[in-house]
Regions:
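RNA-interacting cores
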Residues: 1-240
Length: 240
């Protein structure tokens, strides 16, 4: 299911690291609605867990201009959250319904949209947020790299296994159709202290691609997202 949240920025701007702002909002909503569920999802034995979470999201702006550290937003801000988890869907929908504002974001509407189904073992998708793939050395992979499909399969297998207890039923075959490189600039807690750099850059890709694999896998991945940092606003996809 997809949850569509619309709103506006009261001060007409949002940090360039808006994905982190939206993730913080999502975590706050889950925590306020069900603290034990939040602890189960984001912590293990009192410590933050790196375990993948069953959701992804994308953000869209109307009438905006990107500056060095901020995005000036005159129009609507739309957040699209996707998850195959029924409980999480309920928690997020009810939480957003109760929420009036978060920081400078003022909510105007919330609605649920049914997912379209993949009917065969292949489909053409579009990205709603950029896909980020890295190798075993944490190096971002170019889409032309011979290991791109291998690593995409690796991360898809992890997210499926985390959600349903087992991974891919069949290998995925990713074919770019009309993809372009997108460099995403993020300000992440702890990164500046370690590197003395304010921003980290993610080389990712947006556009249209063909994906072949098991039909059930494709339907779940459409809701879970693909690649790395899905829970931080990357890898959200939909049927074209």
């Amino acid at each position: 299911m997809k949850i569509l949240v619309a709103g506006k920025m009261k001060n007409k701007k949002i940090s360039l690291s808006y994905r982190m702002f939206i993730l913080s909002m999502i975590k706050k909503i889950i925590s306020d609605f069900d603290e034990s569920y939040f602890e189960e999802m984001f912590f293990y034995e009192g410590k933050k867990t790196k375990k993948t979470k069953p959701f992804t999201f994308s953000v869209f702006f109307k009438d905006y201009k990107i500056n060095r550290d901020f995005v000036d937003v005159e129009g609507e801000v739309k957040i699209v959250i996707s998850t195959p988890d029924i409980k999480l869907n309920m928690v997020l929908f009810n939480g957003f319904m109760k929420m009036k504002e978060y920081g400078d974001f003022e909510k105007t509407s919330v609605r649920i949209e049914k997912e379209r189904k993949v009917e065969e073992n292949e489909a053409i998708f579009k990205t709603l947020s950029p896909i980020f793939i890295k190798d075993t050395n944490n190096k971002a992979l170019e889409i032309e790299d011979e290991n791109y499909n291998k690593e995409l399969n690796y991360f898809a297998n992890l997210s499926l296994k985390s959600f349903r207890g087992y991974g891919l039923k069949d290998e995925l075959v990713f074919t770019p159709l009309k993809m372009k490189k997108v460099v995403v600039k993020e300000e992440i807690s702890g990164f500046k202290e370690k590197t003395n750099k304010k921003y980290i850059y993610f080389n990712s890709y947006s556009g249209v691609f063909h994906l072949r694999g098991d039909k059930d896998d494709l339907n779940l991945l459409k809701e879970l997202g693909i690649g790395v940092r899905r829970n931080s606003g990357f890898g959200s996809i939909d049927l074209i």
